[in-house]
Amino acid sequence: IAVEPDSCPSLTRGTYTYDSGDTAGLTPQLMMYTLGRDFIPPIIHAGGLRYHGASPLVSALVHHGLVEAQSVGDEEVYQAASLFLETEGILAAPESSHAIAQTIRAAVVAREEERHEVILFNLSGHGLYDLAFYDRMIPARVARQSVPL
């Protein structure tokens, strides 16, 4: 499953067509899922996923039905990253946290359907350079851990 942010859904809502790989239109045309090179994505926590198109290779896999594409929202990504940090002690990059969110979705479905599955995901980077992403989660964690006086 290829996972992307809801705010930049090239695989799930884009068009499979030739488009430029850059916003200036200087690169060769690439066959990919794209929102159009004129699409200006919002500023999001996962800068590496803030792009108008998807990889031509991943796009071809999705187009031919070999890979499924899903999108996840920011809040679900924050919750998944926080849970992963608290349970596994690993500070995942925001981009990787999209995969973690989708993995949690798949695990919940498997549990509800009483299926035992092996679910793998790619943790492609740490979040040590993305501490601002985690700062957004701290108030929620502190609120959960505080003891009323």
Question: What spans do the regions from the language model cover?
Answer:
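Substrate-binding/catalytic subdomain of NAD(P)-dependent oxidoreductase enzymes
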Residues: L91-T103
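Catalytic phosphate/nucleotide-handling subdomain of diverse soluble enzymes
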Residues: V3, T17, Q102-L149
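Short, glycine/acidic-enriched loop or turn micro-motifs at the edges of active sites
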Residues: S7, H98, L128
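Active-site/ligand-binding loops adjacent to catalytic centers
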Residues: A2-I90, P94, R136-L149
